């Protein structure tokens, strides 16, 4: 969506742009330049960062509710073999990593404020579509490790777990709350004998995203997903594609 995001910014329009914003991190620099030249607000639509369940997870981790974070684990899968679906069209930027692989990375970064430094990955492509349909990733985040797998030709499942030395946090519908069930954050203690459940019923994360963006445009001090954040997240995705070509660690090139 880089071309039209730049055109809209050059026309003086504020832009809430659907993800994936770009096919590689370098292209996002063009959007940042257009934003700055035209003094407009441009934000990639990562709706999950506006959902209160993710604000709660960030709060719990930062206040030490699970002690020292050691590992983040994620999974996001669905089944789609429709050749006419844009997610299965290579020329339209289809593929599992650009469609849903961005979510385990962006939410881990959102919660921890930490960037992966290096990673290993396995990526499988569909022989007919040419798009990536499965990816398994292991990333070094310094004081903790992140691992996840995503797929477009597996039964529907999604989950995120933040595991510390004093407990762990589980999200049952981390990305599509209301579609596969209401948002719930479950905090387990170290012995897995007690748990606290935080419920987020009829929460409409897309509406919260649109409202936050509108308030920011109106001049209010509201946290919206920045293009700099988009750049960092895309750098992780770019590194995953590179890592798929060999068996060793691949550095995440941060700007």
Predicted regions and their residues:
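A general structural signal for well-ordered alpha-helical segments in protein cores
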Residues: 1, 5, 28, 54, ...
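Beta-strand-loop-alpha-helix segment that lines the small-molecule cofactor/substrate pocket
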Residues: 2-49, 64
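Short glycine/proline- and charge-enriched loop/turn segments
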Residues: 12, 84-92, 188-195
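Predominantly a Rossmann-like dinucleotide-binding segment in NAD(P)-dependent oxidoreductases
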Residues: 48-128, 247
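A short glycine-threonine-serine/GTX helix/turn-capping micro-motif
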Residues: 92-98, 195-204
